Amino acid sequence: MLRYIGRRLLQTIPVFFGATFLIFAMVYLMPGDPVAALGGDRGLTEAAAAKIRAEYHLDQPFWMQYLLYLKGVFTLDFGKSFNQQPVIDVMARAFPVTMALAIYALAIESIFGITLGTIAGVRRGGWFDSTILVFSLLLISVPTFVLGFVLQFLLGIKLGILPVTASVSVDFASLTMPAMVLGGVSLAYVIRLTRQSVSENVSADYVRTARAKGLPGGVVMTRHILRNSLIPVATFIGGDLGALMGGAIITEGIFNIHGVGGTLWSAIIKGEPQTVVSVTTVLVLVYIIANLIVDLLYAVLDPRIRYE
């Protein structure tokens, strides 16, 4: 098991360096001059522009800027934005909110998706299965902003059981509706993936053998069917954490949540490469850590993977 963990940890190293290099290169090659844009229509004097470029190392060659960027990543010194605000402070305000929202959405899609998908997979072809398929298709078809406005109207305005927008101090109630919207599409995919996987394993030879041995239905379901069916589902859910955090910009805008999506969009519009690169790098780290956890979960669900 330790060798398996060690291999997976070593595999994350080239992924990290490759991803950070691509991120930095794409931001470096973005059209326009962020320093010149600071002056607006009036522009900056050559001396002022040169001073800003020297302060942010923009006068250095590409490879030197990349090395300084890596040094900042490993020392947690992400520099300052053009308004002299430490980037790490900006991320410290944005990431906890979006992380809480993404984990909440992930919990919704995992609990309800696996439960509904399992029932539909066991009872494939019945009325419940057909209803769940239609429900998941609707979730996939409806745009995120439409689902957000519909839930705001029904749950927030008509029924009044949830806040329409998030408060300044984001709490559990304020995040419930945004989490439902953010995890809506992923919920549909988890339902369909679980249903397909369970329906295939229900008729597998090892399940028939377990039942022939007289094992109780609950034991067959938990130890045999679900344990093998959840491997592809765990792959999707693990990779979805980073996608939820990076793709929360629409949901955050609808519910007035000041998180990663809004921070990243604002940095792109304002032309602040330090903030864009730093936020994206942390998102990459979230992806890598989430996938590492999924790899370790594989070994728990299927011990054979440890020895491959």
For each feature predicted by the language model, list its residue ranges:
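Membrane-interfacial helix-loop-helix junctions in multi-pass membrane proteins
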Residues: R53-F62, D77-I88, V168-D171, L182, ...
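Residue-level recognition of pore/gate-forming positions within transmembrane alpha-helices
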Residues: T12, T20, R42-G43, L137, ...
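Hydrophobic alpha-helical transmembrane segments of membrane transport/permease proteins
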Residues: V15-L67, L159-M177
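Membrane-water interface segments at the C-terminal ends of transmembrane alpha-helices
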Residues: L22-L29, K71-G72, V134-P163, V181-V185
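Small-residue-rich alpha-helical segments with characteristic i,i+4
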Residues: V15, R123-R124, F128-L138, V142-T144
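An internal, D/E-rich "acidic patch" concept
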Residues: D59-I114
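Alpha-helical transmembrane segments of integral membrane proteins
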Residues: L2-Y4, R93-F128, T144, V168-E308
